[in-house]
């Protein structure tokens, strides 16, 4: 394998492709140079098809730029490079010919711990979670298939656990006898410790390795727990070799979890790794409206938009705000409108305003773009300054309750029309500029959490 060639391609792709797309589609690829072909090995059909449709042409162009005299071509395959030192190749035969399930009698049905309210029908889809939902539905239709394991990562309250339960509920609906278990990684550790204390580790192993689907939440909790990681490693391998589904969630990309063994991180990449981002405005509104309908609450559109614009971090925060508005309306007998919502959420909104100030936004944006706050306030008009300045103005409008004139004044005494132009300019550019869209999402996430 020619590491330098693929590394050179990756370095360029890192400058062109948003981080989330790199983690999902490019970094799972393994490369092997064979003759005049750079073979890229994808972990599954889903990744292969996406790379072929969206990135293979660009990768081919990069090969021509890096080694113009060799006339290299790109070939895509599913699997691992045929290199002796690749551990995945050593297990290839095992994965191709699944181990036989134990001949022992099946244990009695397990308590799945599934929440029946978490289904695909009750999950509100948006751009931020579209891929995660699609992958989860594929797993529900074909558990143990190509997307095994399925690894969902993202911040708190974004729907990872909901999707995991939705898969489990769908599997149980199709196969009521299926042994599906959902649990938090903390419980896995606690049960393992208890089994060790009572000399019942073999029973513990049989329990987990006889499942049809294991859904385990917040695997970052395993960090630093070597004995727990060892047991989960063997459980994970046993389930995958038997073509039983594993789904995991984490609050960050698996390779970013410190204290997690490299062999676990490597195996997590065998299937499909998908990020869930904070919901965009339209999705936040849809979440509020959907929740209101399920609860029998008449929520006016203008109230839904008001709440969605002010609260941006996650779904739980939105649902908590709706519960507070609903409870206040029931207790007071008043109709729900924007003024009532402001009153019901006044302490929450005050906290939000206190946490996110124009000064804080300016410092965050300046640090992100590696410029000085003074540059944002100056009269300089170079693109390296105006773009961050416009971004900061948009975020000030989005994240604070300040008026346009107040925002303009905070940016070196500019008028409201300048702020309005900046907002329209950034919103327009985001539609076509993936890198700018990623900047916006990163800054919004940083300031909203």
Swiss-Prot record:
A GO molecular-function descriptor: lipid binding
Renumbered residue ranges of the record's region Domain II: 83-112
Region (Domain I, interacts with DnaA modulators): 1-83
Region (Disordered): 77-114
Binding site for ATP: 157, 159-161
Major localisation: cytoplasm
Region feature Domain III, AAA+ region, mapped onto this chain: 113-329
Keyword Glycoprotein in record: no
Region (Domain IV, binds dsDNA): 330-449
SMART domains in the cross-refs: AAA (SM00382), Bac_DnaA_C (SM00760)
Residue pairs linked by disulfide bridges in the UniProt entry: none
Ranges of biased composition (kind: Low complexity): 89-99
CDD domains xref list: AAA, Bac_DnaA_C
SUPFAM superfamilies: P-loop containing nucleoside triphosphate hydrolases, TrpR-like
Location within or outside the cell: Cytoplasm
Keywords: ATP-binding, Cytoplasm, DNA replication, DNA-binding, Lipid-binding, Nucleotide-binding
Gene Ontology cellular-component annotations: cytoplasm; plasma membrane
Gene Ontology process terms (BP): DNA replication initiation; regulation of DNA replication
Family statement: Belongs to the DnaA family.
Domain-level remarks: Domain I is involved in oligomerization and binding regulators, domain II is flexibile and of varying length in different bacteria, domain III forms the AAA+ region, while domain IV binds dsDNA.
Subunit structure: Oligomerizes as a right-handed, spiral filament on DNA at oriC.
NCBIfam families in the record: DnaA
Physiological role: Plays an essential role in the initiation and regulation of chromosomal replication. ATP-DnaA binds to the origin of replication (oriC) to initiate formation of the DNA replication initiation complex once per cell cycle. Binds the DnaA box (a 9 base pair repeat at the origin) and separates the double-stranded (ds)DNA. Forms a right-handed helical filament on oriC DNA; dsDNA binds to the exterior of the filament while single-stranded (ss)DNA is stabiized in the filament's interior.
Descriptive protein name: Chromosomal replication initiator protein DnaA
Organism from which the protein derives: Halorhodospira halophila (strain DSM 244 / SL1) (Ectothiorhodospira halophila (strain DSM 244 / SL1))
Gene: dnaA
